[in-house]
Amino acid sequence: MAKQDPTSSNTMLPLVGSEFVRPQPLDLTITGDTVKDATGNKVFKVKTPLFGLHNKRILVDPNDSPIVTMKMKVTSKHDRWQVYRGSDLDDKIFTVKRSSTVQLKTRVEVFLKHNQTRESSCDFTIKGRFMKRACTIYVADSTKIIAQVYEGHERLVATIYPNVDYAFIVTLIFIFDLINMGTGI
């Protein structure tokens, strides 16, 4: 499979918000539930509500304002997660699910809001290995890479390509890890 130049231009609409799109590549580190930039500044944190079922996670900014809510569909055999803008469970942005129940390599599909009734072809694909905790995120079923993640020393390192919504990518990374590990990063 051909690798894409990470400095190449991507023309992608912001999925979570335009404030999360940068014209240059962005490296983030993820340790536990905290996401930091290359200078060590906290960018995001993922919170798990204390009460209720533990099938929900909330991505918050450094001021604790909710950016997206990730909610696992409990009755799904494909580890389906639905993602909503902010804390409003009426404003669904996208759905993430395992492509099949039995896999040697993990393949997860992402369906944007407009594509959720058919789910015939995904809008994004995440491919990775369970044991290595590494993955690559592609546009649809193509070879166009928009982000790559690998495991560093006790943390994950993510490279998000230019013009890609990094809140969207961080959300996908957490869901991918939850699907793989069952516990989070």
Curated annotation (Swiss-Prot):
It comes from Arabidopsis thaliana (Mouse-ear cress). This is Protein LURP-one-related 13. Might be related to the phospholipid scramblase and tubby-like superfamily of membrane tethered transcription factors. Belongs to the LOR family.
